[in-house]
Amino acid sequence: MPESLIAGIPVHFPFEPYPVQRAYMEKVIQCLRDGTNGVLESPTGTGKTLSLLCSSLAWIRTRQSEHQQQMVKMEKADFTGLGGGAAGGDLSELAKTMGRANNWGVPKVIYASRTHSQLTQAMRELKRTAYANMRSVVLGSRDQLCIHPEVMREQGNSNKTNMCKLRVHSKTCSFQMRVESRKDHPDLRGPSIMDIEDLVKVGQRLKICPYFASRELVPQADITFMPYNYLLDPKARKANKIELGNTIVILDEAHNIEKICEESASVQIKSSDVAMAIEDVTHIMQVFASGESQDMGGDEPKDFTLDDLTLLKEMLLEFEKAIDAVVVENAVEGTTFPASMMYELLGKANFTYGNVATIVSLLDKLVQYLLVASQQMTIRKGGTFTMLSDLLTIVFANKEDVMSKVYASFKVHVQLEEVKQGHGKQQGGKQHGGWLGKGTIAAATGSIKVAKIINFWCFNPGFGMEQLLNTQVRSVILTSGTLAPLKPLIAELAIPVAQHLENPHIVDQSQVYVKIIGTGPDRQQLISNYANRDNPKYISSLGQTILNVSRIVPDGLLVFFPSYPMLNKCVDAWQASGLWADISVKKPIFLEPRSKDQFTSTMEEFYQAIRDSKGAVFMAVCRGKVSEGLDFADRNGRAVIITGLPFPPLKDPKVILKRRYLEANRTRENQLLSGQEWYNLDATRAVNQAIGRVIRHRNDYGAILLCDSRFKDASQVQQLSKWIRGHLGDRPQCSPFGPIVRELRQFFKNAEANMKLPDERETDSPLETVCKTENEPIAAIPKVKREPGSNATFKSANESAIKVEMANSIKTWTPADYASAAGRKLGGAAPNAMDFMSRLDSNVSSIDFNCCMDSKSGSSGMVKIHKRERSSPTQPESSSQVSKKRYKLVENIKVEPSSSQVKEAPAERADFLRELRSLVTQDQFRRFGKALLEYKDGTYESFQALMVILLDVLSAPKVRYMLVGMRKYLKNEHKDEFDQKVGKL
């Protein structure tokens, strides 16, 4: 492939890069070289993904080459005199070998996007480049990767996750057990790039679990592909063992990144969920009391006791009572409270930072217990326990020392929910020992009509981004086709950005026709605001506009509405008036369905209809599946009509609170948007994304028709993507409908005559990335003339198998996805990577029963029991008796750190080595140097050899602080074992 020198780095690109691609790659390389962050916009169709992959991996490959040269030089270095002053040069080289803190070796790339279909497209792009032989891996969910037949039969992601955990824990999954012995198989470690489907095929062939096998590939991968939720949520990162130190994080399709950051930190719980959780606990207690637990859960002792259940039920009853006491003043819109109210509610039930890890662990064990029991009898599978676990995990995710930020960034909103009669009815209608709570009894008898919904909402996306930056990543690059305007985005995310870019489109001005249509054929104003959207004249005029445009636009026509209600309202009116039938005569009409199954079949029918000479119309909704993830290149989308601005619901509580948050926190320094500016921008970004479905590559062409007179307002125009603004001019105006019809007809006549046909452009499917990587420049392909009105038959990509089953297949993430992590440590809030060492230098507290150890230690916070240890069901049970009997609270006793703990190792490499040489003998220092050189490749064997030397040389109390200081020079995958070995000293 041709090589281009970009920002001093040789980049192999499939063809001579266009100016916009070169500018984009320069910005990427500058970010990686300087260790800074970037926000880069490049319109869809400009080869953004290809440019991103080639530039980042070219820089990685260059760094790898430099690193190898340095290692060769180090191998030739003379370390015989390391103990003396004459070896200053060699000492300097050894310091370079050690690298910076958390910076051993070459950085790695993490490429994240919204959906797995987008990740698959990116991996297909990578396969066509000169970097296809670089090591890569994709991380997916159990729902996508599991091949165990019984787990696959489970309904819902949460049930599959819990069933998988159960089988792994009980060692009854043969696929997972084979991973260790076959993880180095050539089919798994080979040079070929494997997407989700490829991983599943390899797993089936080797009879190993693709989910766990993919995790084994991560440490050696140069680039790892994963969905956003694996990356942005700190708990998900911990569960998937994702190390971010010295990594390059690329967030593609980042136009919704603020919302994703907010939603990953938000959670909801219903009082009806709490009531059902109480029922489930009560049922398990009844089973224990009757001695039937062996029948339900097998012969193994349970990981919880009857006393554990008693205490949990007391806490849930108190939580239910606290929720019942909340006064909702506005029954329609709900009532808003400060974030502290959530901690007060949970505190009344004794859910605290001190015991939340223990409670979450117990809830997870109960879910697994019910999963086993559900195989033998009809019983709920613990979904309410999962919801409670999600709530506690998210609410207590942040450490207590950042609570001021939490209070500023979150709000609690309480709404009322109608409850069905008899919902949550107790099985068998029995009350056991007076343990049915008031809410449970009321729900069972139908005496209450409403339940409360407790929402814990985050409104500060910068809160999550700050946590990401604190992991010591090298660079974060946010990129998309529709990020503009950039300043508000950067301000909300609150990250330092050194590089930013708004690229023009790669297509020529003559290939795009953009107009604002302010009136329909009958001169009725087109404006889809609240006051006009029910106007029959407006709806009729909009339908006539679409009818006239459908007569002119060849092939595919996309029509986007602000919302589903507006789409349905127009469809009903047009069907009643006959306009629907008139449009259908010109082109068959397809409507965007909401269900995944219907969506797949509808897309297949639409692509099939495009083959017909009439084409087809697809009516969809902004922010829907079609507007966010699909490619309508060439004939699939020759024009897009935007019927209105998709503003968020003005009276929605979340929208109201977001606007209030911005107004309350806006300053001149942080440059946050006002509430109204954010409201307008949210609508325009959805429009930009919908527009991006057409004009998908260098030789594509199409029309963009903005059918709402408000698009002429300067405030709206400035929020459109830069390349669209260029077509509207400095002072855009609404054009009369008649001239637009004539211009549009002439535009398509010229385009069909001068642009090359879609069948000449090689594609795999309409859903794949369209920026292909031909070996020759696209511009070199000769243009083919098509006679106007020709009914030529196209042998296009549509005639190949149309793969729509993965289109925009967004997997909804829940905290249950990370709750199953193997080797999980259930402390309070998840500590960061340096917490182990930083705690050696701080005050130490004694351990109480709330402290959870790793289950392997045999000293968990929850005590395993046998049946003989159960409390007697006939014994009077009170909360005080139970607590005294099973749980003993221990006061935290502070221990002052020793002098060796207080002292810290020098931060600079050269200073570190000089001090070490002054503390140890010449022979010890020589052994240390040799072991460090042998560790250059970072293999596990070389790590073990290095640890032997470190523990021998640096375990003495007076030099142990130097041992602690060595941690930052180790590879990330070796740090946990290092911590364990040092912790035993």
UniProtKB/Swiss-Prot annotation:
All residue ranges annotated as the Helicase ATP-binding domain in the record: 7-303
Residues in coiled coil: none
Annotated compartments: Nucleus
Region of interest: Disordered: 858-884
A Gene Ontology molecular function term of the record: ATP hydrolysis activity
Catalytic function, reaction form: ATP + H2O = ADP + phosphate + H(+)
EC number(s) reported in the record: 5.6.2.-
InterPro entries assigned: ATP-dep_Helicase_C, DinG/Rad3-like, Helic_SF1/SF2_ATP-bd_DinG/Rad3, Helicase-like_DEXD_c2, P-loop_NTPase, RAD3-like_helicase_DEAD, Rad3/Chl1-like, RTEL1
NCBIfam families for this protein: rad3 (TIGR00604)
Physiological role: A probable ATP-dependent DNA helicase implicated in DNA repair and the maintenance of genomic stability. Acts as an anti-recombinase to counteract toxic recombination and limit crossover during meiosis. Regulates meiotic recombination and crossover homeostasis by physically dissociating strand invasion events and thereby promotes noncrossover repair by meiotic synthesis dependent strand annealing (SDSA) as well as disassembly of D loop recombination intermediates.
Family assignment from sequence similarity: Belongs to the helicase family. RAD3/XPD subfamily.
Protein name listed in UniProt: Regulator of telomere elongation helicase 1 homolog
Species this protein is from: Drosophila yakuba
Classification of source organism: Eukaryota, Metazoa, Ecdysozoa, Arthropoda, Hexapoda
